[in-house]
Swiss-Prot record:
The keyword NADP does not apply. Signal peptide: none annotated. It is a multi-pass membrane protein. The keyword Mitochondrion applies. One of its GO terms (biological process) is proton motive force-driven ATP synthesis. The chain crosses the membrane at residues 19-39, 56-76, 81-101. Keywords: Membrane, Mitochondrion, Transmembrane, Transmembrane helix. It comes from Arabidopsis thaliana (Mouse-ear cress). This is Uncharacterized ATP synthase C chain-like protein.
């Protein structure tokens, strides 16, 4: 062994140690990323199903205790990056445990609120000494049904199309002498409030509201169908007029688009406005001098139909 080779041995050992330390750091980082992915999926599953939080908290707690024990056993021997990685593991485990505990607390609070809020609301609106609504066979309070009923009434009032039974004033027993002056008619807001004060459960009014909603839906469908029929009639009429004027379009969608643009209005307007514009356009196409024909020709030329030219305009 030469002197040069003998002197190069310490350098080789230092290089091997550096390579080993780098490999250990990379392996530790990879393990940290893998563990992070596992715990991330675990938190997502717990958030979707909070009932698993109790078992998960126990598992994470045991893992955390094991990590703490490993840290105390090896902290005095580990130095450099590995010691920092163990610190990061501890912080990560603590964060995961806190997140799972928070999820469990929110889940328990969500289960308790339906039992606590209805009695408070009942006392706040003046329930006082009146008996609380009875509970069902499953032990669940019927407050949810009462709140659903009142919310349905509010939705009906906001739509402006409530049934006549909802808008009728509630007849109450009048106290005092028979010759007392009649009370003034209650405003619609007061009538609605009196109706909301009633206890829930009259099936006739629910059926009336359902029938009213069905009637409104049927009217909307009728108007929509009429608009679609008018649109189809407009396209057919435009094809006939274009054919009479010697214009042939390769794509029928060009006619439909030109009709829409010739209305000089946005397509996303109300159904009633669409129907009115289609009716006016149909009437104009049926006359000898169509006021909307020239804008219609302009739109066709803008779509790239070279067959449409100045001779197709109406003077």
């Amino acid at each position: 062994m030469t002197k040069r080779e003998y002197n190069s041995q310490p350098e080789m050992l230092e290089g091997a140690k550096s390579i080993g330390a780098g490999a250990a750091t990379i392996a530790s980082a990879g393990a940290a990323i893998g563990i992070g992915n596992v715990f991330s999926s675990l938190i997502h599953s717990v958030a979707r199903n909070p009932s698993l939080a109790t078992t998960t908290v126990l598992v994470v707690t045991l893992t955390l205790l094991g990590g703490v024990a490993a840290f105390y056993l090896h902290s005095f021997r580990l130095k450099g990056p590995l010691k920092k990685i163990i610190y990061l593991f501890l912080v990560f485990f603590i964060a995961v445990g806190i997140s799972l505990i928070r999820i469990k607390a929110i889940h328990l609070l969500g289960l308790a609120l339906p039992l606590l809020v209805p009695p408070l609301v009942w006392n706040a609106i003046g329930g006082g000494g009146e008996a609380l609504p009875s509970t069902g066979p499953n032990g669940a309070s019927s407050y949810s049904e009462w709140f659903t009923y009142t919310s349905d009434l509010e939705d009906s009032a906001s739509s402006g199309r409530t049934s006549s039974s909802v808008n009728q004033p509630i007849q109450r027993e009048q106290a005092g002498p028979s010759n007392a002056l009649p009370e003034p008619a209650a405003s619609p807001v007061a009538q609605q409030q009196d109706h909301l004060d009633q206890p829930f459960g009259e099936g006739g009014e629910r059926e009336a509201r359902a029938q009213e909603h069905d009637r409104i839906s049927a009217e909307v469908e009728t108007i929509t169908s009429a608009c679609e029929n008018l649109e189809a009639a407009m396209v057919r009429k435009a094809h006939i007029l274009l054919h009479q004027r010697g214009v042939t379009l390769g794509d029928p969608e060009d006619v439909k688009r030109a009709l829409q643009l010739a209305l000089h209005d946005d397509w996303e307007h109300d159904i009633d406005d669409r129907k009115r514009h289609f009716t006016v356009l149909r009437r104009d196409f049926g006359t000898a001098r169509c006021e909307r024909w020239n804008p219609f020709i302009d739109e066709l030329r803008g779509l790239g139909n070279r067959q449409v030219n100045a001779r197709h305009y109406v003077d």
